[in-house]
């Protein structure tokens, strides 16, 4: 905690002093790319991904220790009947991750990705955002700090994902609080909300944003009022990655909402991040557009768990492999253009 005693102060200081890209590494990557055995631009976005890796790691593009970090939290707003599933499913899915039985486990095996799962006090749901703040400032800051531990032990590509019954309600409230519009524009089915459940979900988002409307101009305050533990932890992980020169792939609707908090605090806060995919959650494409990003994949997925980010990691690994492994024209004895 900072000397002033305010829990968010250290994070505000970090957000004011974000490191930028490594210009020399970027130039070196562009120069090598110009010598590879292909026409300029022939690998399309793969080339841009390689440059992005170089700029944010400060070295030639490589992915040797990719990691998927899943943050799991429970939410008091589920008491409003916003989801057909009970909150106990969150803990059950954490057990499924540990047993290797979830979709994310299979994708991690396929693409040789590490996996860490962070259980964020699942027995103690956050406050119901339609009635009170989700978290105290102290609890929110502590959870951000815990999320920063995602990169402890070393990784060179971090994929951010989540698990939490009720958290698409939270994501919709964050987006409505940040960007305005109507609740209907930001609320989608999540884990299968429809009919009366979907109506309750929309109403809950409206009530929550109305309750906290006088406190939403500060992004970190918005997060602690409308967010949740996995939101705070993901924000902390993304911020820590920036400070440690670790590129990040953001997953779906909920992870994007966490990222949006940081961008609202500093417009450059997500320059080291890619959006892995656009999900089937209706508000996600609008949220991505607000961030000024272009997703790598569009597969109609809306599972969460970091699955879209993990699939995108395979593309990022391929981009690095092409950049580092392809021969130059001189090495291959292939004639370059005149």
Curated annotation (Swiss-Prot):
<dbReference type="InterPro" id="IPR003200">
    <property type="entry name" value="Nict_dMeBzImd_PRibTrfase"/>
</dbReference>
<dbReference type="Pfam" id="PF02277">
    <property type="entry name" value="DBI_PRT"/>
</dbReference>
<dbReference type="GO" id="GO:0009236">
    <property type="term" value="P:cobalamin biosynthetic process"/>
</dbReference>
<comment type="pathway">
    <text>Nucleoside biosynthesis; alpha-ribazole biosynthesis; alpha-ribazole from 5,6-dimethylbenzimidazole: step 1/2.</text>
</comment>
<protein>
    <recommendedName>
        <fullName>Nicotinate-nucleotide--dimethylbenzimidazole phosphoribosyltransferase</fullName>
        <ecNumber>2.4.2.21</ecNumber>
    </recommendedName>
</protein>
<dbReference type="InterPro" id="IPR017846">
    <property type="entry name" value="Nict_dMeBzImd_PRibTrfase_bact"/>
</dbReference>
<keyword id="KW-0328">Glycosyltransferase</keyword>
<dbReference type="InterPro" id="IPR036087">
    <property type="entry name" value="Nict_dMeBzImd_PRibTrfase_sf"/>
</dbReference>
<keyword id="KW-0808">Transferase</keyword>
<comment type="function">
    <text>Catalyzes the synthesis of alpha-ribazole-5'-phosphate from nicotinate mononucleotide (NAMN) and 5,6-dimethylbenzimidazole (DMB).</text>
</comment>
<keyword id="KW-0169">Cobalamin biosynthesis</keyword>
<dbReference type="InterPro" id="IPR023195">
    <property type="entry name" value="Nict_dMeBzImd_PRibTrfase_N"/>
</dbReference>
<comment type="similarity">
    <text>Belongs to the CobT family.</text>
</comment>
<feature type="active site" description="Proton acceptor">
    <location>
        <position position="305"/>
    </location>
</feature>
<dbReference type="GO" id="GO:0008939">
    <property type="term" value="F:nicotinate-nucleotide-dimethylbenzimidazole phosphoribosyltransferase activity"/>
</dbReference>
């Amino acid at each position: 905690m900072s000397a002033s005693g305010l829990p968010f102060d250290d994070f505000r200081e970090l957000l004011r002093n974000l490191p930028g890209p490594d210009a020399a590494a970027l130039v070196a990557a562009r120069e090598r790319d110009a010598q590879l055995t292909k026409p300029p631009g022939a690998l399309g976005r793969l080339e841009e991904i390689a440059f992005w890796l170089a700029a944010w790691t400060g070295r030639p593009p490589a992915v040797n220790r990719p990691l998927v970090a899943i943050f799991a939290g429970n939410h008091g707003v589920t008491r409003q009947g916003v989801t057909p599933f009970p909150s106990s499913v969150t803990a059950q899915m954490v057990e499924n991750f540990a047993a290797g039985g979830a979709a994310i486990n299979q994708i991690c095996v396929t693409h040789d990705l590490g996996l860490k799962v962070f259980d964020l006090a699942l027995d103690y749901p956050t406050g119901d955002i339609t009635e009170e703040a989700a978290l105290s400032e102290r609890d929110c800051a502590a959870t951000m700090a815990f999320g920063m531990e995602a990169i402890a032990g070393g990784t060179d590509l971090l994929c951010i994902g989540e698990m939490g019954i009720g958290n698409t309600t939270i994501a919709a409230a964050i987006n409505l609080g940040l960007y305005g519009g109507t609740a209907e524009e930001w609320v989608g089915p999540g884990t299968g909300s429809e009919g009366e459940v979907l109506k309750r979900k929309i109403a809950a988002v409206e009530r929550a944003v109305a309750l906290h409307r006088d406190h939403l101009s500060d992004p970190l305050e918005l997060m602690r009022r409308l967010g949740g533990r996995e939101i705070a932890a993901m924000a902390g992980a993304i911020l820590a990655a920036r400070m440690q020169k670790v590129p990040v792939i953001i997953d779906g609707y909920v992870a994007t909402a966490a990222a949006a908090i940081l961008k609202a605090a500093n417009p450059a806060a997500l320059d080291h991040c890619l959006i892995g995919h656009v999900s089937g959650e209706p508000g996600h494409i609008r949220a991505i557009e607000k961030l000024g990003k272009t997703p790598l994949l569009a597969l109609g997925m809306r599972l969460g768990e970091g699955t879209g980010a993990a699939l995108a990691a395979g593309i990022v690994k391929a981009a690095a492999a092409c950049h580092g492994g392809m021969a130059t024209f001189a090495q291959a004895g292939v004639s370059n253009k005149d």
